[in-house]
UniProtKB/Swiss-Prot annotation:
Highest taxon of source: Bacteria
Keyword RNA-binding: no
Gene Ontology MF terms in the entry: GTP binding; GTPase activity; translation elongation factor activity
Phylogenetic lineage: Bacteria, Bacillati, Bacillota, Bacilli, Lactobacillales
PANTHER family with a match to the protein in the record: ELONGATION FACTOR TU, MITOCHONDRIAL, ELONGATION FACTOR TU-RELATED
Main location: cytoplasm
Purpose of the protein: GTP hydrolase that promotes the GTP-dependent binding of aminoacyl-tRNA to the A-site of ribosomes during protein biosynthesis.
Annotated region (G1), positions in chain: 19-26
Protein name: Elongation factor Tu
Reactions the enzyme catalyzes: GTP + H2O = GDP + phosphate + H(+)
Region (G5): 177-179
PROSITE patterns given in the database record: G_TR_1, G_TR_2
Length: 398
């Protein structure tokens, strides 16, 4: 059989399974792939068993070792990439490094236990890193005889979600058994199909990177005699065309406006540069010393420079090449945003004396220069050129 081309006709969505250890995240992932392969056989829908998902290869993302399984499958209307992080620490690292961007997630809660500490932590992290759409799968319902108990567990989950600003009263809760579905029990297979149609309907199609406002982190700047100043870098999101008005944001106190007079890639003139392209942008009315690496070129008004923010961070363990000792309040490392390092001081949350290598923690940061940041911007924490932590902006403060 000839190899099929990757079909772009279906919208692509990234999702994942989250929840407490042993509540059935990986079993559910296996059940989804297996039931879809039985009910909707296509070249994409191949059954994956628990063992193959559980034996996720180690990946390194920004210097951090993470185990994550990636599986793909499709429904009638969409193509999905699904991530399953086996260990709790892997999940935390995944969320904080932005290694696995999720458009939505399935929160798996065992009906036999109800919400547990990691259930809460995963909901909080989803809120912090901007995963806006959660669907609940109450697993192991075949092991609970009491209908009232199931209702209580559902109420408890909904209350917990509301506590973290998710629409707890309205979001979908599906009750089933991943193991029974995997074993081929048709009643529970139907529930997996119901879960997938809920995912299709409830998790909105993500905005494509090219539809978002322009953001181009500046990597290099040079001047061309007689033509002006060129800034180069990879377009993070959005598009850029000749005659577009842009802003140069970050590092300097004021944001400068300019007009694009040329877009080049591989020394060829382009009509427009798109997200993902490495381009050189010719700017009118900008002197060579008015723009530098670490600033961003952006659509006017779309992103602002800030010095104070809250961040959710993971501090590398000694084994990952991180620090060997804890750090304390007012620790002053470098924060690496996109293309540059900026010194900043860290304020720890009340009641936290110190942070150990391998911990994750919410911190307040104050940078010495303003940088173009927004909720969801990722950064590394560095000391003497080596990475000691990784983080994501959860809230802008000033």
């Amino acid at each position: 059989m000839a190899k099929e081309k990757y079909d772009r006709s279906k919208p692509h969505v990234n999702i994942g399974t989250i929840g407490h250890v042993d509540h059935g995240k990986t079993t559910l992932t296996a059940a989804i792939t297996t039931v879809l392969a039985r009910r909707l056989p296509t070249s994409v829908n191949q059954p994956k068993d628990y063992a193959s998902i559980d034996a996720a290869p180690e990946e390194r993302e920004r210097g951090i070792t993470i185990n994550t399984a990636h599986v793909e499958y499709e429904t009638e209307t969409r193509h999905y990439a699904h991530i399953d992080a086996p260990g709790h620490a892997d999940y935390v690292k995944n969320m904080i490094t932005g290694a696995a961007q999720m458009d939505g997630a399935i929160l798996v809660v065992a009906s036999t236990d109800g919400p547990m500490p990691q259930t809460r932590e995963h909901i909080l992290l989803s809120r912090q890193v901007g995963v806006k759409h959660l669907i609940v799968f109450m697993n192991k319902v075949d092991l609970v005889d009491d209908e009232e108990l199931l209702e209580l567990v559902e109420m408890e989950i909904r209350d917990l979600l509301s506590e973290y600003d998710f629409p707890g009263d309205d979001l979908p809760v599906i009750q089933g058994s991943a193991l029974k579905a995997l074993e081929g029990d048709s009643k529970y297979e139907d529930i997996i199909m119901e879960l997938m149609s809920t995912v299709d309907e409830y998790i909105p199609e993500p905005e494509r990177d090219t539809d978002k406002p322009l953001l181009l982190p500046v990597e290099d700047v040079f001047s061309i005699t007689g033509r002006g100043t060129v800034a180069s870098g990879r377009i993070d999101r959005g598009t850029v065309r000749v005659n577009d008005e842009i802003e140069i944001v970050g590092i300097k106190e004021e944001t400068k406006k300019a007009v694009v007079t040329g877009v080049e890639m591989f020394r060829k003139q382009l009509d427009e540069g798109l997200a993902g392209d490495n381009v050189g942008i010719l700017l009118r009315g900008v002197q060579r010393d008015e723009i530098e690496r670490g600033q961003v070129i952006a659509k006017p008004g779309s992103i602002n420079p800030h010095t104070k923010f809250k961040g959710e961070v993971y501090i590398l363990s000694k084994d990952e090449g991180g620090r060997h000792t804890p750090f304390f309040n007012n620790y002053r490392p470098q924060f690496y945003f996109r293309t540059t390092d900026v010194t900043g001081s860290i304020e720890l949350p009340a009641g936290t004396e110190m942070v150990m290598p391998g911990d994750n923690v919410t911190i307040n940061v104050e940078l010495i220069h303003p940088i173009a940041v927004e909720q969801g911007t990722t950064f590394s924490i560095r000391e003497g050129g080596r990475t000691v932590g990784s983080g994501i902006v959860s809230e802008i403060e000033a």
